[in-house]
Amino acid sequence: EGFVIMDKFKLVATSGTARAAEFNTQHGRVSTPVFMPVGTQATVKALSPEEIKNTGASIILGNAYHLSLQPGVKLIHDFGGLHSFMNWDKPILTDSGGFQAFSLSETNKITDDGITFKSPSDGSSHFINPEQATLNQIQIGADIIMCFDHCIEYGASLIEVEAAMDRTHRWASLCQQTFQNYGNEDRQSLFGIIQGGTSRDLRLKSLEILSALDFKGYAIGGLAVGESKSTMYELVNLCNQYLPPGKPRYLMGVGSPEDLLSLIHISEP
């Protein structure tokens, strides 16, 4: 019948704050550190599902915002879920669309209620709030669901960064309530996202507030958006020191081989 996903989280080895771990999902086991190939719109570009498996990938990433636009949540749900739709029988993590607040910032409008996006394909307007973003991911059958967050651009003022972080925290509570009401906790898990820009103080505040919400896993968001590598490495190391120790960690947006290896090893003594 599948696993209760993060009750099976296990630390295999540690060195400083660097960790090797494994966890089970209803679609199989994931060993970390792990790289997630990006399958934004239910496909990893230029590769078939079999070719992806042949690379050794054990989990892939989808984007619920893009999938909700095309082909649509209902079609994917009616097809039997995202795994069936893309012919992938291993774990899938879906991002909520919060990063598009940053990447599509010229065409969207952000309020405390949610984000109004313009579709990159036809220019139509679409409003997404934390509840809908969470429901979309539940309905398409993602193994790991990400909270809806406000990822703000690098260089924003401290006041703007703090406002985006506070909004992220409020949205995280709404995502959690929605998941508790409609999610399948035996088969899916919800991760919170740490924000706070490049401010150590704000990062520590975000860590404290979101840790208290007791998500099944945590992501470090808002990095790899233009800051220096030394700043990114410093903030990842800071977050690693304070994230709940018995839970998985997801570093969002980082994918170069150099950064992957550096950030895995930077936490070692």
Language-model features: locations:
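Glycine-enriched alpha-helix->loop->beta-strand junction motifs that scaffold or abut catalytic
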Residues: 56-57, 141-142, 210-218, 244-246, ...
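Residue-level detector of conserved catalytic or cofactor/ligand-binding positions
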Residues: 262-269
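Charged helix-capping and loop-helix junction motifs
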Residues: 78, 207, 232-237
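Non-catalytic, usually N-terminal nucleic-acid engagement modules in DNA/RNA processing proteins
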Residues: 5-184
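Alpha/beta enzyme core
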Residues: 139-140, 167-190, 195-225
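Glycine-rich beta-to-alpha transition loops that act as phosphate-gripper elements at the mouths
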Residues: 193-197, 248-258
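Alpha-helix N-cap and loop-to-helix initiation/capping positions
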Residues: 125, 156-167, 198-205, 227-231, ...
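Conserved radical SAM core fold
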Residues: 68, 149-157, 199, 216-227, ...
